[in-house]
Regions:
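C-terminal helix-coil-helix/basic helical segment that borders enzyme active sites and/or dimer interfaces
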Residues: 366-405, 511-525, 546-558
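A short core secondary-structure module
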Residues: 187, 191-245
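Alpha-helix capping/hinge segments and adjacent helical runs
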Residues: 2-5, 259, 374, 396-474, ...
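A structural-propensity feature for long, helix-poor, extended segments
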Residues: 131-133, 142-145, 149, 448-451, ...
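Internal maturation/activation junctions in enzymes
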Residues: 65, 126-130, 141-183, 376-395, ...
């Protein structure tokens, strides 16, 4: 029976037929690998996700974590699943062999982890955050910090978090007030409160390594005065042994709409709940130089943003497959025009409107998965391309695509979940089926790791204008290369290319128009519409790339025919949505800017 988590055939098509990851084994970093080792890793990920993560997805949602004032309790299946995950070695799939990693291509590693996000996004959040934490310290930490904290995280003994937001500041990191007081021994004592910290407390691991943004006294105001600190839940000795509890206290759990299996916490640092060394203050260790914390944390945040897009895609994908399976099995009604009321009912997939909803989901989730894996492939290019120019190009293109890869799947794969519920009808609105939970879980993704609005400001206000517009030029030129290949291919690909070309031209024209007079308030007033429109253009590009990867001689194969039809749908129904959005942007509409608070 086909999996209802992800489509392995789609993953194989994207990785091998389109992205050609097997060619990466010609590069020194991946020379020990082969198509077989890539497939073995995907097989392992699918098996462990199916057997260890998926079975308790509903149970973790119904029995969310509890806190009795002393301990956080989760259902035991979460720990068992995470232990199984640690045994696979997949946490380190993309990391260097020198730190115990499998050194797989990032595209393969991303595909592997998507299985776990589709199976149980809440349980998979713990290793997701831990890996981001470890990657940041590998990039910015000292050798001693790597030995003390990273290696236990990669072994599955320690878990990690990132602590940015504070109750009064939210996403406005310039306004954080947590302070870090320097000590004579070179450590710091931290005092403050952090809010919305996923995985902030639990008993799933021996220790929790918090990465905390704070200010050293006398630091410059705003984001330029933020430093980054390692603050472990339990202090670690020079020999790696665990010592006293640090002065980090769980003040409470947040009770959420979805993602309920992941603890979400309010943490208090330095309130005297514990007294390491006989006094209050959470012991912290500075990462790198003072006042570089935000730049360092963005290393983790950019990784997390692409990971959020992958998680949103996975939730949309599994919801699509489950609604597809239901539509094939659920008999109801008869074809339009049927005259015999005694005729047998047909499966609801026979009804055109149900097929419309399924086709919309397919176009969203398969387009989003292509984008996520394309970005992972860019990371491989950034790290291993032989030419410096190719590495720099991959880095810039990935920078431009990051806010889109975070936000487009978070919006449109959530729409896919909404359609999955609709396909099931009343049954989809009940807890008897998974699709309502997938919607609730996915609703977080347009919010965390930078809201939709923040990503829109990042795309239009920074990524498209940086380096004198080099990001915009590279994106449109890269799409233009695909368009040219499609024109040369002829047939339907050429026709789709013509439609995409006209829309890409509007991206360039509208971007220049918005910044024509340098007024940031007016330029950014409708940034969310810009993000959505450019996101649709990028997904149309992903679909054109997939069409070009389909072999013409296999046009009759149902998988290939389905891909072509989904591409047609996206170009016919979705891409035209960008027209009114670009019209709004081109007019530099002031409606939202001119609205006054007292008019509401």
């Amino acid at each position: 029976m086909p999996s209802t988590l992800l489509s392995r055939r789609d993953l194989d098509f994207l990785l091998h037929d389109w992205l050609r990851v097997a060619e990466l084994v010609e590069r020194p970093r991946y020379a020990e690998h082969s198509r077989e080792t890539f497939d073995d890793a995907l097989d392992l990920a699918e098996r462990v996700a199916t057997e260890q993560f998926a079975p308790h997805n509903r149970a973790a949602d119904l029995a969310e974590p509890t806190f009795d004032g002393q301990r956080v309790r989760l259902i035991p299946q979460v720990r068992a699943a995470l232990d199984s995950f640690a045994e696979t070695g997949l946490l380190t799939a993309g990391l260097d062999a020198t730190v115990g990693g499998l050194q797989l291509p990032h595209a393969v590693a991303a595909a592997c982890f998507t299985w776990f996000q589709a199976a149980n996004v809440a349980t998979s959040a713990y290793p997701f955050l831990t890996l981001g934490n470890a990657n940041l310290l590998l990039a910015h930490g000292s050798p001693e910090q790597v030995d003390t904290y990273v290696r236990p995280m990669l072994d599955g003994r320690f878990f990690g978090t990132m602590c940015l937001s504070e109750p009064h500041a939210g996403s406005s990191l310039a306004d954080i007030t947590t302070r870090a007081e320097p000590q004579a021994d070179g450590t710091y004592r931290l005092f403050g409160t952090k809010m919305w910290i996923s995985g902030g407390d639990h008993e799933l691991a021996e220790n929790i390594v918090h990465l905390v943004l704070a200010r050293i006294p006398g630091a410059p105001p705003g984001v330029k005065g933020i430093s980054l600190f390692i603050v472990p839940k339990v202090l670690v000795g020079p020999d790696g042994s665990l010592g006293d509890r640090n002065d980090v206290v769980l003040a409470g759990l947040n009770h959420k709409m979805g993602f309920r299996g992941t603890t979400n916490t309010l943490l208090s640092f330095g309130d005297g709940g514990h007294t390491p060394g006989g006094r209050a203050g959470a012991v912290g260790h500075l990462v790198g130089a003072p006042h570089q914390g935000l730049a360092q944390m963005f290393h983790m945040m950019n990784e997390a943003r692409i990971g959020v897009g992958a998680g949103a895609t996975a939730l949309g994908y599994t919801g699509y497959l489950k609604s597809l399976a239901y539509a094939k099995e659920r008999p109801q009604g008869r074809p339009v025009g049927a005259k015999d009321p005694a005729a047998a009912q047909v499966p609801i997939i026979e009804h055109p409107d149900v097929r419309r909803m399924l086709l919309a989901q397919k176009s969203y989730v398969e387009g989003a998965l292509a984008l996520v894996l394309y970005c992972a492939r860019l990371l491989d290019e950034q790290k291993t391309a032989p030419a410096d120019a190719d590495r720099e190009r991959a880095h810039l293109l990935l920078d431009v695509l990051t806010p889109i890869t975070k936000s487009w799947p978070s919006q449109w794969c959530l729409t896919a979940n909404d359609l999955a519920i609709q396909v099931l009808g009343g049954a989809g609105y009940t807890r008897d089926h998974d699709v309502e939970q997938h919607y609730r879980d996915n609703r977080l993704n347009p919010i965390h790791e930078g809201t939709h609005g923040i990503q829109a400001l990042d795309l239009l206000g920074r990524k498209m204008t940086m380096q004198g517009g080099a990001g915009l030029a590279l994106l449109t030129a890269t799409i233009g290369d695909t368009i040219e290949r499609a024109r040369q291919a002829g047939g339907e690909a050429a026709e789709l290319a013509g439609r995409l070309a006209a829309t890409v031209d509007r991206v360039t024209a509208v971007t220049r128009r918005l910044w024509a007079d340098g007024d940031p308030v007016l330029a950014l007033a409708n940034a969310s519409a810009y993000l959505e429109a450019v996101g649709h253009v990028v997904i149309a590009w992903m679909w054109l790339e997939q069409v070009l990867a389909l072999p013409p001689e296999r046009a009759g194969d149902p998988f290939h025919a389905g891909k072509r039809q989904a591409a047609r749908y996206f170009f016919s129904v979705e891409l035209p949505r960008t027209g009114p959005q670009f019209d709004l942007l081109d007019s530099r509409d002031r409606t939202s800017v001119d609205m006054r608070p007292d008019w509401f």
